[in-house]
Amino acid sequence: PTYATPAKLIYEWKDYLPEHFATPFAGHESLPPWAVVSLCNWNGGAAKKLSFKAADVPGLPKADAYAAFEVKTQKFLGVFKPGDSIEQELAAHAARVIRLTPLAEEGRYLIGTDLNLSCGMEIKSVSGRTATVRDEVRPHEAKCTFLLWKGGEGAVDPGP
């Protein structure tokens, strides 16, 4: 099933192929809205650094801070303000997918999963550190990464 609108370009298409795409996800029954940014290095011969700003991502809800999580490496990249640059170095023909989670009130936030590139639409519900996957995804389970956000500081929740 379709869970979101098609990806949109973040920046004007100037080079060989577009390199920055964004897909916003809203309307999830148990998660606040987020967006996924895809970075693509179409160059066949060289690595390339690609960057973007959260403020430029279409459909991303406004916030004072965003948690960034990279799907392939399953790494928390940090907390960024809307105007901060988020940069990744991509090998030739490589791509990266980054989930941006708006951070508002203090608490625990789901910032990433390892099961789906949407980083959340495979999740039916979240309670504390427990995420339940949708019936159509089973028998697979998702490894979820949570961020504890308090006093303007974020740290990955180490779990029990």
Write out the residue ranges for each language-model feature.
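Mature N-terminal, pre-catalytic/accessory segment of carbohydrate-active enzymes
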Residues: 110-152
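Carbohydrate-binding surfaces of carbohydrate-active enzymes
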Residues: 1-128
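Interfaces that engage single-stranded nucleic acids at replication/repair/recombination sites
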Residues: 140, 159-160
